[in-house]
């Protein structure tokens, strides 16, 4: 089964893969940030947003993974095997959790559209040969807040204001009072 945890948010695993693994903060830093900014919403029984829900799930998943790692660490006798398991969890699963946490914390902090625009900008920047790209990569916090991601398809037709009609010099008849009471 090929499940992309970013699909419903307009992103993809491939889009996040353009960011190097050392781009993402440590899980501890991401958990501290999520807790500092969104603790009340994350602990609330109310539904806040799909990003809050996804963040809750990623945090719970990481907690369960740490429980498993602790169990493996205390029950696996062979130090080499234990090191392999710990390394695999930290490198592979840790990166996926760091990406998930970063994505959802960033979407809650900067807005989904801004994060998507950043991912696209970074993807374009990293794929451009070094000789033709600016020396510095785009930075999420410096993107303009009014970034607009244009959707494909026809743009909405703009209505031009109609010209004002000339008022006649003759007095107008009053409409009945019953019309004014309607909303």
From Swiss-Prot:
Segments of this protein annotated with the region Disordered: 136-183
Subcellular location, principal: virion
GO biological process terms on file: microtubule-dependent intracellular transport of viral material towards nucleus; symbiont entry into host cell; viral penetration into host nucleus
Gene Ontology molecular function: any one: DNA binding
Residue ranges of the region described as RNA binding: 177-183
Biased composition, class Basic residues, residue ranges: 149-176
Chain segments carrying region 3 X 8 AA repeats of S-P-R-R-R-[PR]-S-Q: 155-177
GO CC, alphabetical: host cell; host cell cytoplasm; T=4 icosahedral viral capsid
InterPro entries found in the cross-reference section: Hepatitis_core, Viral_capsid_core_dom_sf_HBV
Keywords tagged on the record: Capsid protein, Cytoplasmic inwards viral transport, DNA-binding, Host cytoplasm, Host-virus interaction, Microtubular inwards viral transport, Phosphoprotein, Repeat, RNA-binding, T=4 icosahedral capsid protein, Viral penetration into host nucleus, Virion, Virus entry into host cell
Subcellular location: Virion; Host cytoplasm
Sequence repeats, residue ranges: 155-161, 162-169, 170-177
Motif Bipartite nuclear localization signal positions after renumbering to this chain: 158-175
Phosphoserine: residues bearing it: 155, 162, 170
Post-translational modification: Phosphorylated by host SRPK1, SRPK2, and maybe protein kinase C or GAPDH. Phosphorylation is critical for pregenomic RNA packaging. Protein kinase C phosphorylation is stimulated by HBx protein and may play a role in transport of the viral genome to the nucleus at the late step during the viral replication cycle.
Pfam family, one: Hepatitis_core
Subunit organization: Homodimerizes, then multimerizes. Interacts with cytosol exposed regions of viral L glycoprotein present in the reticulum-to-Golgi compartment. Interacts with human FLNB. Phosphorylated form interacts with host importin alpha; this interaction depends on the exposure of the NLS, which itself depends upon genome maturation and/or phosphorylation of the capsid protein. Interacts with host NUP153.
UniProt function note: Self assembles to form an icosahedral capsid. Most capsids appear to be large particles with an icosahedral symmetry of T=4 and consist of 240 copies of capsid protein, though a fraction forms smaller T=3 particles consisting of 180 capsid proteins. Entering capsids are transported along microtubules to the nucleus. Phosphorylation of the capsid is thought to induce exposure of nuclear localization signal in the C-terminal portion of the capsid protein that allows binding to the nuclear pore complex via the importin (karyopherin-) alpha and beta.
Family listed: Belongs to the orthohepadnavirus core antigen family.
Protein name in UniProt: Capsid protein
Gene: C
């Amino acid at each position: 089964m090929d499940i992309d945890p970013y699909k419903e948010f307009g992103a993809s695993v491939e889009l996040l893969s353009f960011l190097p693994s050392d781009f993402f903060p440590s899980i501890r830093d991401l958990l501290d940030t999520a807790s500092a900014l969104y603790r009340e919403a994350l602990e609330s029984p109310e539904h806040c947003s799909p990003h809050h829900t996804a963040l809750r799930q990623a945090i719970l998943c990481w907690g369960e993974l740490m429980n498993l790692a602790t169990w493996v660490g205390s029950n696996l006798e062979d130090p080499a095997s234990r090191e392999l398991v710990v390394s695999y969890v930290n490198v592979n699963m840790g990166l996926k959790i760091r990406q998930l946490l970063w994505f959802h914390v960033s979407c809650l902090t900067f807005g989904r559209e801004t994060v998507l625009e950043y991912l696209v900008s970074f993807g374009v920047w990293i794929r451009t040969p070094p000789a033709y790209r600016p020396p510095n990569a785009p930075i999420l916090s410096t993107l303009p807040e009014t970034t607009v991601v244009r959707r494909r398809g026809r743009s909405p037709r703009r209505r031009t204001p109609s010209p004002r009609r000339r008022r006649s010099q003759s007095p107008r008849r009053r409409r009945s009072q019953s019309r004014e009471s309607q909303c």
